[in-house]
């Protein structure tokens, strides 16, 4: 059994910070669960281009506000407590912080290894062993 407190991730290599978000990666590939589980905060006013070509992601909004806008069709969805969205089609999108920090719980498949950040195309790269398969 794995039991962790998200507070124990703060200040470790499993807390990844950019200009627009901070992600506390509580379960990772090394944990062998087949998915990764993160608590992420989107900063107010931030705007992040994301296109997970290699991963599927489900997101549960816990507190705060923001929006997500799909690039293909320009549809915009407001985000707040209780909203769940799933990027089941590798949807390219803009994730935008609102007036308050947006705290979300994220699940990724395949699982992240821990240090991923979005590249210039908004993508998380696959680990080397997955690319070779």
UniProtKB/Swiss-Prot annotation:
Which Gene Ontology molecular function entries are recorded, alphabetically? ectoine synthase activity
- Is Lyase among the key words of this record? yes
Superkingdom as given in the UniProt entry:
Bacteria
Going by the UniProt record, its keywords in alphabetical order are:
Lyase
Q: What class of enzyme is it?
A: lyase
Q: Per the UniProt record, which EC number(s) apply here?
A: 4.2.1.108
Q: Which Pfam families match?
A: Ectoine_synth (PF06339)
GO biological process terms, semicolon-separated:
ectoine biosynthetic process
Under catalytic activity, the entry for this protein gives: (2S)-4-acetamido-2-aminobutanoate = L-ectoine + H2O
Q: Which residues cross the membrane?
A: none
InterPro entries linked to this entry: Ectoine_synth, RmlC-like_jellyroll, RmlC_Cupin_sf
The record's SUPFAM superfamilies line, in alphabetical order, gives: RmlC-like cupins
Q: Determine if ATP-binding is one of this entry's keywords.
A: no
Pathway in which the depicted protein is active? Amine and polyamine biosynthesis; ectoine biosynthesis; L-ectoine from L-aspartate 4-semialdehyde: step 3/3
Per the entry, what this protein does is:
Catalyzes the circularization of gamma-N-acetyl-alpha,gamma-diaminobutyric acid (ADABA) to ectoine (1,4,5,6-tetrahydro-2-methyl-4-pyrimidine carboxylic acid), which is an excellent osmoprotectant.
Similarity remark: Belongs to the ectoine synthase family.
Q: State the name under which the record lists this protein.
A: L-ectoine synthase
Q: Which organism is it from?
A: Bordetella petrii (strain ATCC BAA-461 / DSM 12804 / CCUG 43448)
């Amino acid at each position: 059994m794995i039991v962790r407190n998200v507070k124990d991730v703060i200040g470790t290599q499993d807390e990844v910070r950019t200009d627009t978000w901070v992600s506390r990666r509580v379960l990772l590939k090394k944990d062998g669960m087949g998915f990764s589980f993160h608590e992420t905060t989107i900063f107010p006013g931030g705007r992040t281009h994301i296109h997970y070509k290699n991963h599927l992601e489900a997101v549960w909004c816990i507190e705060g506000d923001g929006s997500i806008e799909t690039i293909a069709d320009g549809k915009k969805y407001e985000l707040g407590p209780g909203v769940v969205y799933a990027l089941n089609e590798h949807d390219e999108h803009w994730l935008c912080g609102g007036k308050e920090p947006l705290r979300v719980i994220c699940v990724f498949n395949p699982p992240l290894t821990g240090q991923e950040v979005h590249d210039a195309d908004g993508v998380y790269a696959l680990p080397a062993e997955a690319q070779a398969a």
